[in-house]
Regions:
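Hot-dog-fold acyl-thioester-processing enzymes
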Residues: 2-84, 147
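Short, intrinsically disordered/low-complexity patches at protein termini
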Residues: 41-43, 82-83, 88-90, 114, ...
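HotDog/MaoC-like acyl-thioester-processing domains
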Residues: 1-13, 94-99, 103-148
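Mid-chain, well-packed structural core segment of small domains
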Residues: 74-96, 102
Length: 148
């Protein structure tokens, strides 16, 4: 994990970075279900999952979102603050044993009328699996301080 100050003016449209990978485990499923109370059989019942397309349990979308966002924390910008996420989509299923990583692309920059000392930056997050397929996509909106 590293810290780097990047002001609003310094963000470049199209800039891309790729995180390290992380393999999804049985433990991830169990811990996430316990934290959220989401024990749907699609995630937790191996016999039920055999009847589904793909024949195996599907990772919780919220878990993949959490892990995918967490992977981006390898770079910390102390002058950027999360405003929220838009356009979250669970594009493909993730299974135990899949390895995911997150591609972060700067997709938009705009003025912030409520905060004249800051601007808004949109990071397009794409969580991709070991086959290079996008499994989750979202827009992360940041409020970023301008240079003084």
């Amino acid at each position: 994990m590293s810290e780097q100050i990047i002001h609003f003016e310094d963000y470049k449209l199209g800039h891309e970075r790729l995180t390290t990978g992380r393999t999804i485990t049985e433990t991830d499923f169990v811990v996430h279900a316990g934290h959220t109370g989401d024990f749907f059989p699609h995630h937790m019942d191996a016999e039920f999952a055999k009847t589904l397309p793909g024949g195996q349990r599907i990772a919780h979308g919220t878990m993949i979102f959490s892990i995918g966002v967490g992977l981006t924390a390898s770079l910390i910008n102390p002058v950027a603050f999360s405003y929220g996420y838009d356009r979250l989509r669970f594009v493909r299923p993730v299974h135990i044993g899949d390895t995911i990583r997150t591609r972060v692309t700067i997709s938009a920059k705009e003025e912030d009328p409520k905060r004249p000392k800051s601007g808004r930056v949109v990071e397009r997050l794409e969580v991709i699996n070991q086959r290079g397929e996008v499994v989750l996509a979202a827009d992360h909106i940041l409020v970023v301080e301008r240079k003084a």
